[in-house]
From Swiss-Prot:
Substrate binds at S135. The gene is CBR4. This is 3-oxoacyl-[acyl-carrier-protein] reductase. Homotetramer (in vitro). Heterotetramer with HSD17B8; contains two molecules each of HSD17B8 and CBR4. Does not form homotetramers when HSD17B8 is coexpressed, only heterotetramers (in vitro). Keywords: Acetylation, Fatty acid biosynthesis, Fatty acid metabolism, Lipid biosynthesis, Lipid metabolism, Mitochondrion, NAD, NADP, Oxidoreductase. It is an enzyme of class 1 (oxidoreductase). It comes from Homo sapiens (Human).
């Protein structure tokens, strides 16, 4: 199998760390983000012949066009990472409906659409590997994150069901569920207070999550699995 990987949400955070690690391991990368300039900057930092694309994962025609373009320029995609995500914290009673919809569209529907688009090629070539980036709150829930928790919890159910659907085609689907990790999404959190509740006593780094993502991408006998990377936080939630 060729080593062509599409990383959605690859311009920053966990997605960018995944792209960096995979580039070092010899993969050809498509770095995909809503902001094309950010994607180009991330792809440029990788060196080599990696490419950047702009895509709003919540729009099916955007996703379809992106896959057509990246396969035209890089070849068939056989590895897919879904790391695009947004979060708008707030109590449910104070959350605007449009904010609910945008989180569900980006965090859940977006991954569904990219997986659907990738299936055509992966089924044709009888093989592929997908890792969707979830969250520990999708498994445990968290006050003030009911919508985000729903989107990430839904991603787990979707991934497990899809893993069953495509296993006979030699396509694997797994989830990595991070806890608190240093990203733009967590930069405003009260780290000193929160890390006291983490058994390992600190926030994680994006590269630590990236190693888990690549492990699942490359593990030929693992599918339908949720790998939690949270410093032990799940032990006390």
């Amino acid at each position: 199998m060729d080593k062509v990987c599409a990383v959605f949400g690859g311009s920053r955070g966990i997605g960018r760390a995944v792209a960096q690690l995979m580039a070092r391991k010899g993969y050809r990368l498509a770095v995909i983000a809503r902001n094309l300039e950010g994607a180009k900057a991330a792809a440029g930092d990788l060196g080599g012949d990696h490419l950047a694309f702009s895509c709003d994962v919540a729009k099916e025609h955007d996703v379809q066009n992106t896959f057509e373009e990246l396969e035209k320029h890089l070849g068939r995609v056989n590895f897919l990472v879904n790391a695009a995500g947004i979060n708008r914290d707030g109590l449910l009673v104070r959350t605007k409906t449009e904010d609910m919809v945008s989180q569900l569209h980006t965090n859940l529907l977006g991954s569904m659409l990219t997986c659907k688009a990738a299936m055509r090629t992966m089924i044709q070539q009888q093989g592929g590997s997908i890792v969707n980036v979830g969250s520990i709150v999708g498994l445990k829930g968290n006050s003030g994150q009911s919508v985000y928790s729903a989107s990430k919890g839904g991603l787990v159910g979707f991934s497990r069901a899809l893993a069953k659907e495509v296993a006979r085609k030699k396509i694997r689907v797994n989830v990595v569920a991070p806890g608190f990790v240093h990203t733009d999404m967590t930069k405003d959190l009260k780290e000193e207070h929160l890390k006291k509740n983490i058994p390992l006593g600190r926030f994680g780094e994006t590269i630590e999550v990236a190693h888990a993502v690549v492990f699942l991408l490359e593990s030929p006998y693992i599918t339908g699995h949720v790998l939690v990377v949270d410093g032990g936080l799940q032990l006390i939630l």
